[in-house]
């Protein structure tokens, strides 16, 4: 199963504030080692950190209208500061990996959320076979860089 693992933003991460230099370098080294473990285990599919929401945009959909909303966005607890995309055998395996993760924001309470990705089989018979084949072709093309 594939899961998205999201590091929730904090007030400091939203303000672009990093820990002191020494502590930040240790965090980066620890995260690097953790990511290496994920790669060696065949779990890591993708990972990245995100800039604060002040650098982002949202597009609100209302019928046929699209409205662009400039960041920053006020609800810090709903914002994501970074993510991993993992291939794991179960939610329990994902939880065990997250428990091994270095604290993403040393010195403050932080949270990591794990969400399974919706896979074609989750839609059952509602997903036409030709759409499933189409999805698979797109995934292969994307992986090949086309």
Language-model-derived ranges and their functions:
Residues 1-146:
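Conserved, structured core segments of small domains
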């Amino acid at each position: 199963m594939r899961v998205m693992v999201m590091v929730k933003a904090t007030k400091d991460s939203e303000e672009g504030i990093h820990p002191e230099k020494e502590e930040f370098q240790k965090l980066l080294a620890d995260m690097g080692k953790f990511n290496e473990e994920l790669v060696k285990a065949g779990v890591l599919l993708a990972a990245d950190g995100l800039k604060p929401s002040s650098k982002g945009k949202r597009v609100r959909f209302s019928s046929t209208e699209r409205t662009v909303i400039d960041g920053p966005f006020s609800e810090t607890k709903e914002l994501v500061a970074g993510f991993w995309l993992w291939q794991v055998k179960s939610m329990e395996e994902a939880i065990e990996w997250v428990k091994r993760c270095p604290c993403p924001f040393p010195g403050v309470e932080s949270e990591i959320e794990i969400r399974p990705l919706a896979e074609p089989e989750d839609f059952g018979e509602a997903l036409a076979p030709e759409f499933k084949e189409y999805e698979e072709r797109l995934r292969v093309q994307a992986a090949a860089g086309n």
